[in-house]
Curated annotation (Swiss-Prot):
Transfers an acetyl group from acetyl-CoA to L-homoserine, forming acetyl-L-homoserine. It is found in: Cytoplasm. CDD domains: CBS_pair_arch_MET2_assoc. The gene is metXA. GO terms for biological process: homoserine metabolic process; methionine biosynthetic process. NCBIfam families: homoserO_Ac_trn (TIGR01392), PRK00175.1 (NF001209). It comes from Methanohalophilus mahii (strain ATCC 35705 / DSM 5219 / SLP). The lineage of its organism: Archaea, Methanobacteriati, Methanobacteriota, Stenosarchaea group, Methanomicrobia. Its main location: cytoplasm. Transmembrane segments: none annotated. This is Homoserine O-acetyltransferase.
Length: 483
């Protein structure tokens, strides 16, 4: 366990006192919701962030349970100092309706029969999942979210939240998702469902207490994992390597993923949840733009360059529909070879993008305070020597008061030598752009991008230099982009 972990956590359970009504009109007499929380709720309950999980996820998004071999599924972005900073935010993640990790689903006991629901469990939708989350938050006394975030099926929930409860959240984050399930996505899910249904132990979904349709569920998971990866990631991860048992490494990987999955997931839940994904269509037969006409929250939509399960064009459709309604929306693309799974793996890029959107990462948080400077009246030779000594490309020039009066770059030095310019006063830039320590990092980064500059001096209220923000610093935060 690292210092930036939320530590050991426990899953909590909330039991509804009233029946829960579904979009279909059906009711569930008894509903239990599994959820986890991280961080501390502030006095006015204004720091709450809801995390929505993907198809086979659960409420355990961060930290450790006793006996865990690895932390929660989104631990890379949840914890002290991470994007979802538990020193600042109160994070909630609940298992979805229809799941099998503590929230009522097909494997739960039907109070009328005393037996597992199986296929008698009513059909559910993404909207039902969101309505249950809304009920949980209301029962916890939370009437407003600072933000909501989710990837894949979790992203669908975020979109549904923004449509169903437009004034409930301030910021919405959708990763590697879609507003309308495509025929290809439906096709993969149908093949996975058929693998389960055609298992000899399927027994029309009434397999509880006897033999589970493990082979079918394992095959369904193998199909899923193929779609979560990319061609590049398979080449990098497996190549054509052969294991000792004469299986290709990729075959061994898929068998392992399938076999281990059967011990932690219910086949019926897989059917119900993929069915809800397939039915998801926020256009409602009209257009996304019309559906998004009442949205009030700011949006960040993130796609993955190598995701062929939820391709970038689907994220771009969301962005276009939001933009047509003048919604404040930012669109970013993870440059990654990991495929769909990149939203769970790209630690550097995710923490940078999410932190800047949530608005708590400032220039002062990341700027370098160890800045090499020179004073007015210095010579070209002094500037060149300092650049070589400090391996610097930008040298701020200061007045005796500490105020920045100009900046000289390695390009300026090169130009001076080529043109036989002897005075530094004739080459330094005086019309310089600066930043402040409290400026958001995203704002400063945009200034650097728009003006094609690689460093931005940071000054205080008096104009005195206090640090410098470089493109190298930002790149180091993001981490090396994968192909």
């Amino acid at each position: 366990m690292t210092e930036r972990s939320v530590g050991y956590v426990e899953t909590k359970h909330h039991h509804l006192k009233e029946p829960f009504r579904l979009v279909s009109g059906d009711e569930l007499a008894e509903v239990s919701i599994a959820y986890e929380t991280y961080g501390k709720l502030n006095s006015d309950k204004s720091n709450v962030i809801l995390i929505c999980h993907a198809l086979t996820g659960d409420a355990h998004a961060a930290g450790w349970h006793e006996g865990d071999k690895k932390p929660g599924w989104w631990d890379i972005v949840i914890g002290p100092g991470k994007a979802f900073d538990t020193n600042k935010y109160f994070i909630i993640c609940s298992n979805v309706l229809g799941g099998c990790k503590g929230t009522t689903g097909p494997s739960s006991t039907n109070p009328q029969s005393g037996l597992p629901y199986g296929l008698s469990f009513p059909r559910i939708t993404i909207e039902d999942m969101v309505n249950l989350q809304h009920t949980l938050l209301n029962n916890l006394g939370i009437s407003r979210l600072y933000a909501i975030a989710g990837g894949s099926m979790g992203g669908m929930q975020v979109l549904q939240w923004a449509v169903s409860y437009p004034g409930f959240m301030k910021r919405s984050i959708v990763l590697a998702s879609t507003a309308i399930s495509s025929p290809q996505q439906i096709a993969f899910n149908e093949v996975a469902r058929q693998a389960i249904i055609r298992d000899p132990y399927w027994n029309d979904g009434d397999y509880y207490g006897v033999e589970l349709p493990k082979q079918g569920l394992s095959l369904a998971r193998m199909i899923g994992h193929i779609t979560y990866l990319s061609d590049d990631s398979m080449h990098d991860k497996f190549g054509r390597d052969i294991r000792e048992n004469e299986m290709f490494q990729v075959e061994s990987y898929l068998h392992h993923q399938g076999d281990t999955f059967t011990s932690r997931f219910d086949p019926n839940s897989y059917l119900y949840l993929t069915g809800a994904i397939d039915k998801f269509d926020l256009s409602n037969g009209y257009s996304l733009a019309k559906t998004f006409s009442n949205i009030e929250s700011e949006f960040m939509v993130i796609s993955v360059s190598s995701d062929w399960l939820y391709p970038s064009y689907q994220s771009e459709e969301i962005v276009q529909a939001l933009g047509s309604n003048d919604v404040d929306v930012q669109y970013r693309k993870l440059i990654s070879h990991f495929g769909h799974d990149a939203f769970l793996l790209e630690k550097g890029q995710l923490n940078y993008l999410l932190s800047t959107f949530l608005g708590h990462l400032t220039v002062g948080d990341v700027m370098s305070e160890d800045v090499s400077t020179l004073h007015e009246g210095c010579t070209l030779e002094e500037a060149a020597q300092l650049m070589i000594l400090k391996n610097a490309t930008h040298i701020p020039i200061l007045a005796t008061s500490g105020r920045i009066t100009g900046i000289v770059t390695s390009w300026d030095i090169t130009r001076a030598v080529a043109n036989k310019i002897s005075s530094i006063e004739n080459i330094l830039s005086r019309d310089i752009l600066t930043s402040r320590p409290d400026e958001s990092l995203s704002s400063a980064a945009l200034v650097m991008e728009d003006h094609a500059i690689s460093a931005l001096p940071v000054v205080d209220d008096r104009g005195c230099l206090v640090g410098i923000l470089s493109s190298d610093t930002i790149s180091a935060m993001v981490g090396k982009g994968t192909k």
